[in-house]
A protein has these predicted regions:
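Short, contiguous acidic/charged loop-to-helix segments that flank catalytic cores in large enzymes
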Residues: 154-163, 198-202
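A mature extracytoplasmic/lumenal domain signature
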Residues: 38, 84-86, 144, 186-188, ...
Length: 246
């Protein structure tokens, strides 16, 4: 059951726009370009806090999830320009409620784990949760066993083996059970630096999933639970993942 994940962002933004505000935005005077090869998708990757400034592509701006979506499939090479900005976000109570929603069939075992790890601050709980994945019992594997029964319970307590989406999804679910607004984010990780052209090249094999949590004093904070896995527990190809501290 993945009903807790965002699905209809435009409808949600229309209903929650009074709860989501951008404050004190300012230009960082940083621009960059992305060259997209044809990949038959509509979404447009970008760095965080970026404004599209190209006029050579028709897009829909998804304010709710802070992403750009092309109106047409990207079936030819495109060079797209962005400008970065710095901003502070305010998340209203309606959106905080939305980002803490969970499926109705969550197992009592997961709820009990959250209660047993009750913390005085969100950061303390998130550190406990992150460190739980670094205890040596979890493994990274691109070809794990199939889930059965309650997927997240089975992964967290029994299987303990999977790829980035398993870890990000479980992390977000447990954070939400602790009443911490959170969401899954997908994108690219790593890439290859071209020293001659001074650019990074990303391939589909570089796709990755991680978590973002909302902290009132910091806004959306990126946390990659997959990076907690010890190198010795990697059972399939995985680039070294840098730790993200709160």
């Amino acid at each position: 059951d993945k009903s807790w994940r965002p699905s209809s962002s435009y409808y949600l933004f229309d209903n929650y726009k009074s709860s989501f505000k951008v404050k004190d935005g300012r230009d960082l005077n940083q621009t960059y370009q992305i060259i997209l090869e044809p990949f038959k998708k509509k979404w447009i990757p970008s760095l965080k806090n970026s404004k599209l400034i190209s006029n050579n592509i028709e897009i829909s701006e998804d304010y709710f999830n802070q992403i750009y979506v092309s109106r047409d499939l990207i079936d030819r090479k495109k060079q797209i320009s962005f400008k970065r900005y710095k901003t502070n976000y305010y998340l209203g109570e309606d959106l905080k409620d939305y980002y803490t929603k969970t499926p109705s069939n969550i197992s009592n075992r997961l709820k009990t784990w959250v209660l047993n790890n009750n913390s005085s601050t969100p950061t303390e709980f998130l550190n406990k949760l992150y460190n739980n994945f670094s205890d040596g019992s979890y493994y990274y594997n691109l070809s794990p066993q199939n889930f059965s029964g309650n997927n997240y319970e089975n992964f967290f307590f029994n299987l303990k083996e999977g790829y980035c989406e398993y870890y990000a999804g479980t992390f977000v679910l447990l954070a939400r059970l602790a009443n911490i607004p959170s969401r899954i984010v997908t994108g690219y990780y790593g890439g290859e630096l071209n020293d001659v052209g001074d650019f990074y090249k990303f391939k589909q094999k570089d796709t990755h999933a991680w978590a973002e949590v909302w902290l009132d004093d910091k806004g959306w904070v990126r946390i990659d639970p997959t990076s907690a896995i010890p190198d010795s527990n990697v059972r399939n190809t995985l680039n070294n993942l840098s730790l993200i501290h709160i």
